[in-house]
A protein has these predicted regions:
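Conserved acetyl-CoA-binding loop-helix of GNAT-fold acetyltransferases
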Residues: 111, 117-130, 134, 153-157
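Acetyl-CoA-dependent GNAT
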Residues: 16, 24-107, 112-113, 125-127, ...
Length: 185
């Protein structure tokens, strides 16, 4: 599978030789907003809500996964795609299929800091969606941190809806948010 999106980049299946380049990408980001979780336990009812909160200053956040995790993801992958320009990797997406074969789970959707806002993430997500269609998976789910407001906005812009969270999901104990989209089969 190779898709040419412009003269700027190509999306293709990753090879093991792409891993070092993926690991070299600067995946940090800056944000002025986060999703803050509010939990209320009143008279036997637990209510959980998220709200957008503006931070007092710009916050730089490092990618939540350890580099060794990408090698493990490569070994366990169902789908691993890269976006490249002139043979240089600019971003990647890693997806696995859940045990019930009902969900294409995007664990990593990453674009190097210098290459953002050039539709690379959109192209990677579009190829992941096509892959899920071909695999006859009815749902595509993307995970991101509550701190990753740019990632949250990206998911919402692409029609994914908030469908859940997991407290202390990442190694650094950040909360994971899950955004999903039904796949037309």
């Amino acid at each position: 599978m190779t898709s040419i999106y412009s003269t700027k980049f190509v999306v293709r299946e990753a090879t093991e030789n792409d891993l070092p380049a993926c690991l070299q990408l600067d995946l940090s980001y800056e944000t002025e907003y986060v999703w803050q979780m509010d939990v209320r336990d009143e008279e036997g009812t637990i209510a959980v809500g998220f709200r957008t909160v503006r931070l007092p200053r710009l916050m730089r956040v490092v990618y939540p996964r350890e580099p060794a995790g990408l090698t493990i993801a490569w070994q366990k992958r169902d789908c691993f795609l890269v976006a490249e320009t002139s043979g240089v990797v600019r971003g990647y997406i890693v997806m696995r299929v859940d045990a019930g074969r009902t969900n294409a789970w995007v664990s990593d959707l990453a674009v190097g800091r210098a290459w953002r806002r050039q539709k690379i993430g959109s192209a990677l997500l579009a190829e992941a969606y096509r892959w899920a269609q071909k695999a006859k998976l009815p749902r595509l789910t993307v995970e991101t941190q509550t701190k990753n407001y740019p990632g949250i906005s990206f998911c919402q812009k692409h029609g994914l809806f908030f469908c859940g969270f997991n407290d202390r999901y990442y190694a650094n104990h950040d909360i994971a948010l899950f955004f999903a989209q039904n796949v037309r089969l």
